[in-house]
């Protein structure tokens, strides 16, 4: 019995140390606030990207239709860009060319349409609701006209919520390409009332 008691008392200090170790607070790391200098620096680098190209996979999913395509996005200035959607065989399904004050859309039959509102035109002709004006910035990892967003531990966009005219879009940034500087999104998903748009960027070219 005495032997057992001594053994028991010897274990007490060790048990106390283990309990104390379990209560030591763990550092949560640096705050990733939208006002942090690291985010401001990253944001400024993205805003300076006036010309770029990216290509990859596009998916539009809703109760009414499902569209899968390859896409090519070419931006030559903040107000000039081209969006090309092609099918698995490489044939053009849709080409959108946007310039200040005028937008031209060419469908898979070669018919051309002109408008001053690219988002409205693409919705009327294809049935797809794509927030093009905002997507121009979201695709780069910029929040655009919303201040409702969170950052990941690398001070990049993680999630944003954008509301306009009673419509709410939620954008989730799922992966980034760190082979380019600054790092740019490689996978993101847009959600709006049962509609989903998935983009997977296979490559980026910064000019």
Curated annotation (Swiss-Prot):
InterPro entries registered for this protein in UniProt: LolA/LolB/LppX, OM_lipoprot_LolB
PROSITE patterns, A to Z: PROKAR_LIPOPROTEIN
Family annotation (Pfam families): LolB
Record keywords, A-Z: Cell outer membrane, Chaperone, Lipoprotein, Membrane, Palmitate, Protein transport, Signal, Transport
Localization, UniProt: Cell outer membrane
SUPFAM superfamilies, sorted: Prokaryotic lipoproteins and lipoprotein localization factors
Signal peptide stretch: 1-21
Keyword Transmembrane: no
Lipidation, N-palmitoyl cysteine type: 22
UniProt GO cellular component terms: cell outer membrane
Lipid-substituted positions (S-diacylglycerol cysteine): 22
Membrane topology field: Lipid-anchor
One BP annotation, GO: lipoprotein localization to outer membrane
Assembly notes: Monomer.
Similarity field: Belongs to the LolB family.
Protein name as it appears in the record: Outer-membrane lipoprotein LolB
Species for this entry: Yersinia pestis
């Amino acid at each position: 019995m005495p032997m057992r008691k001594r053994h028991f008392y010897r274990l007490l200090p060790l048990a106390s140390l283990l309990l104390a170790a379990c209560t030591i607070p763990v550092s949560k790391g640096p705050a990733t606030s939208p006002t942090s200098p690291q985010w401001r620096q990253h944001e400024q680098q993205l805003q300076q990207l006036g010309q770029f190209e990216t290509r990859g996979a596009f998916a539009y999913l809703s109760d009414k239709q499902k569209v899968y395509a390859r896409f090519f996005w070419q931006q030559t200035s903040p107000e000039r860009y081209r969006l090309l959607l092609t099918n698995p065989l490489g044939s053009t399904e849709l080409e959108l060319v946007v310039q200040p004050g005028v937008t031209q859309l060419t469908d898979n039959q070669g018919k051309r349409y002109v408008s001053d509102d690219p988002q409205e035109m693409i919705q009327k002709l294809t049935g797809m609701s794509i927030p093009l004006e905002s997507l121009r910035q979201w695709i780069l990892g910029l929040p655009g006209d919303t201040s409702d967003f969170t950052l990941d531990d690398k001070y990049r966009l993680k999630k944003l919520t954008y509301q306009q005219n009673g419509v709410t879009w939620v954008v989730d940034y799922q992966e980034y390409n760190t082979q380019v500087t600054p790092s740019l999104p490689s996978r993101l998903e847009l959600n709006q009332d049962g509609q989903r748009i998935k983009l997977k960027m296979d490559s980026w070219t910064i000019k």
